[in-house]
């Protein structure tokens, strides 16, 4: 394989998109973005692709809108056959390239693994996922095995001040105003 990507050592990456099929004969690929603003995917550089358990670094040489999607040309991929090897692989970035947020803003990944506790001190469980519903984001909380209400999972709306009382990054804890019976 004549890929000119650079192998990297760190394993911490954030998936921000996925490659689709090849486009043309000069190494272009369709790109699907998982970011809120699809084009912001191109603000983050370099990109990393996990190939056979190794993170390989790529730089975007060029990109453009195509129909209702986007296509990208990566440095070192000059023929369709090389680009085809990235089809359906995820695009990841180094967390360090993300903009810093204010004290009251959070990336979803920061909330994963945090303990969720009611204002009365009841331990609801641990955040395992987030859902985007359109009206508001929702915490997916895996309940403790000894949950008094028999819950295995809870969906808690991420409504600041109404439901989410406090997010403590240092203590890895989210305080919520939520009935444990739900």
Swiss-Prot record:
Which NCBIfam families does the record match to this protein? Answer: 16S_RimM
Instruction: List the GO terms this entry assigns under cellular component, sorted alphabetically.
Output: cytoplasm; ribosome
- Tell what the record comments on domains: The PRC barrel domain binds ribosomal protein uS19.
MF GO annotations: ribosome binding
Name used for this protein in its record: Ribosome maturation factor RimM
Question: What does the subunit section of this Swiss-Prot or TrEMBL entry state?
Answer: Binds ribosomal protein uS19.
Compartments annotated for it: namely: Cytoplasm
Its ancestry begins with: Bacteria, Pseudomonadati, Pseudomonadota, Gammaproteobacteria, Vibrionales
User: What does the sequence similarity comment in the record state about its family?
Assistant: Belongs to the RimM family.
Chief subcellular location equals cytoplasm
Q: Which GO terms describe its biological process?
A: ribosomal small subunit biogenesis; rRNA processing
Report the residue ranges that make up the PRC barrel domain in this protein: 103-182
């Amino acid at each position: 394989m004549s890929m000119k990507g650079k192998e990297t050592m760190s394993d911490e990456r954030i998936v921000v998109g996925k490659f689709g099929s090849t486009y043309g004969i000069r190494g272009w690929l369709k790109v699907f973005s998982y970011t809120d603003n699809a084009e912001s995917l191109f603000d983050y550089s370099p990109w990393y692709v996990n190939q056979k358990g190794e993170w390989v670094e790529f730089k975007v040489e060029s990109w453009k809108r195509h129909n209702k999607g986007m296509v990208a040309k990566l440095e070192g991929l000059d023929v369709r056959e090389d680009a085809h090897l990235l089809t359906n692989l995820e695009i990841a970035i180094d967390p360090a390239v993300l903009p810093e947020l204010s004290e009251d803003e959070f990336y979803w990944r920061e909330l994963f693994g945090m303990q969720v506790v009611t204002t009365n001190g009841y331990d609801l469980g641990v955040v395992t996922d987030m859902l985007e519903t359109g009206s508001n984001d929702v915490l997916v909380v895996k309940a403790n095995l000894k949950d008094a209400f028999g819950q295995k999972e809870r969906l808690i709306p991420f409504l600041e001040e109404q439901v989410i009382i406090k997010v403590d990054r240092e203590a890895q804890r989210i305080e919520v105003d939520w009935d444990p019976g739900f």
